Regions:
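Glycine-rich flavin
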Residues: 49-68, 216-219
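Aromatic-lined carbohydrate-binding/catalytic grooves of carbohydrate-active enzymes
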Residues: 35, 44-47
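Flavin (primarily FAD) cofactor-binding/catalytic cores of flavoenzymes
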Residues: 1-33, 38-39, 68-170, 174-347
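Short, flexible helix/strand-to-coil boundary loops that buttress conserved ligand/catalytic motifs
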Residues: 40-44, 51, 62, 199
Length: 347
């Protein structure tokens, strides 16, 4: 039996592992993927982070390369793999936990091949789990090509002609920008877009956000509450310029679909040929069969990652304790805090 098991060996799980390693804990990381970093490795081919390398680090190890440059997805996948190797973090791959229970003071983690036991558990599966596509998409004709943004790889994957990108987040914008070179692109958005430069006065925008106290704004502060009410901005002006030139057309929120017709909230319609649903992800915590671990809405029940269930913790959730909780640059702060809380119950 382990002192502690971390479910998920992505950026959040590895950051937690780093701090536990420093304190000599007997712990194990469980990773469902074939390799550490697959969540990055399997993203679309052209993906680059909008956080520069100097803001793309986990505790104790920097990303190789020029600090102001923007790492690609494969760099990040390699970095995470090398991070686990460098700190000799114990990771068990190809191990999906499909159920977790607590019997007396011991957690039981059910996998397809075994039941693992631990005194404490950190759930680091993150806030982005199952791709979400609106149910009305099922009413579209089979002739309409449809994929979720998590399945998108490159423009060659999309049939010739026009394409509708549904969703106004940074992933949707990056995909729309790439497709605008080869396809007629329309974006469906549900709110006005705000654009921020990647650099301002030769400094990364993230440097300015940090100086303004916004990058790591804490959950219940005035800055944090203000930030939570705002939609995430688009980073970079390439999309803005393509919208201005007409290379990317904008439409409102999609509310219904039938055959090859898409209906927007303003009453307009669109004849669909190909659709990329950049509509985000939903969290699924039904596999946690522990009373009080999950609230009535199905979300983790916690305060700054600490569950009311003794010995159970969460890490990597959006706004877990601060703005950077789900970002690679900020997850280490939460990991350090959780370590201090874990040590308290061991005293």
């Amino acid at each position: 039996m382990k002192d502690l098991i971390i479910i998920g060996a992505g950026q959040a799980g590895l950051a937690m592992g780093y701090y536990l390693k420093q304190e000599g804990y007997n712990f194990l990381l469980l990773e469902a993927g074939n390799r550490i970093g697959d969540s990055w490795r399997n993203r679309y081919d052209s993906l680059r982070l909008f956080t520069p390398r100097e803001y793309s680090n986990l505790p104790g190890m920097i990303v190789k390369g020029e600090g102001n440059g923007f790492p690609c997805k494969d760099e990040m996948a390699t970095y995470l793999e090398e991070y686990a190797r460098h700190f000799t973090l114990s990771v068990q791959l190809q191990t999906e936990v499909f159920k977790i229970k607590k019997e007396k003071d011991i957690f039981e983690l059910h996998t397809p091949t075994e039941i693992l036991q631990a005194k404490k558990v950190v759930i680091a599966t993150g806030g982005f789990q199952q791709p979400y596509i609106p149910s009305f998409s099922q009413h579209l004709s089979s002739h309409v090509f449809q994929i979720h943004s998590s399945q998108y790889k490159s423009p060659s994957q999309i049939p010739e002609g026009k394409v509708l990108v549904v969703g106004g987040g940074n992933s949707g914008m990056q995909i729309a920008v790439e497709l605008a070179k080869t396809h007629g692109v329309t974006m469906s958005i549900s709110h006005p877009l705000t654009f921020l430069p990647l650099r301002l006065f030769r400094k990364s925008i993230f440097s300015w956000l940090e100086k303004l106290g916004l990058l790591y704004a804490e959950l219940n502060t005035k800055r944090g509450k203000w930030f939570q009410k705002r939609k995430d901005p688009m980073f970079g002006f390439e999309g803005k310029e393509l919208i201005r030139s007409g290379a990317i057309k904008l439409e409102g929120k999609v509310v219904h679909a039938s055959e090859n017709s898409i209906m927007f909230q303003n009453g307009g319609t669109y004849s669909a040929e190909s659709i990329i649903w950049s509509t985000g992800f939903i969290q699924n915590y039904k596999w946690i069969e522990i009373e009080k671990a999950v609230n009535e809405k199905g979300f983790p029940n916690h305060v700054k990652g600490i569950s009311p269930v003794r010995g159970l913790y969460y890490i990597g959730l959006p706004w877990q304790s601060q703005r950077g909780s789900a970002l690679i640059c900020g997850v280490g702060k939460d990991a350090a805090y959780l370590l201090s809380e874990i040590k308290k119950i061991d005293q």
